[in-house]
Amino acid sequence: MALYEHVFLARQDISAQQVDALVEQYKGVIEANGGKVGRIENWGLKSLTYRIKKNRKAHYALMDIDAPAAAIQEMERQMRISEDVLRYMTIAVEKHEEGPSAMLQKRDRDDRGPREGGDRGPRREFGDRPPRRDGDFQRGPRPDRAPREDRA
């Protein structure tokens, strides 16, 4: 049997209990076809980068699966039929990762230094250019226009 990581996105208007029921349904499909489901993570309701089937948010779920290819094909077939599943992706892996996935790990932002004064430094000088004057658009005297020949 092969090892897989499977992630699917469920519609935003279903509840968390319905997402758990979907996970259990697909877990049952895998087990009925001779596979095992290891870690199951529910990442919750997250914003999508772009709309998928008129949804701006989706419930994310991850499953670590040890199953034959036929079990994965059957699960994906049922996901294509289901209206609650927006997208899914199954990836074959060498081994399953231990511990929580990257989406569930708390990001430690303390290692960043303080950001004093924004992230841009002071304006640099451009050598022979005069200093910039904001709002002062005077560029010196302008010569008079020549008379137009085509005026009637």
UniProtKB/Swiss-Prot annotation:
CDD domains, A to Z: bS6
- Is Protease one of the keywords? no
Single GO biological process annotation from the record? translation
GO MF annotation terms: small ribosomal subunit rRNA binding; structural constituent of ribosome
For this protein, the record's SUPFAM superfamilies field holds: Ribosomal protein S6
Q: Where is this region: Disordered?
A: 96-152
Q: Which of UniProt's keywords are assigned here? A: Ribonucleoprotein, Ribosomal protein, RNA-binding, rRNA-binding
| A GO CC term assigned to this protein in UniProt | cytosolic small ribosomal subunit
Establish whether keyword Transport is in the entry. no
What does this protein's UniProt record list under function? Binds together with bS18 to 16S ribosomal RNA.
**Which family is this sequence assigned to?**
Belongs to the bacterial ribosomal protein bS6 family.
Q: What is this protein called?
A: Small ribosomal subunit protein bS6
Please name the source species.
Answer: Rhizobium etli (strain CIAT 652)
Q: Which gene encodes it?
A: rpsF
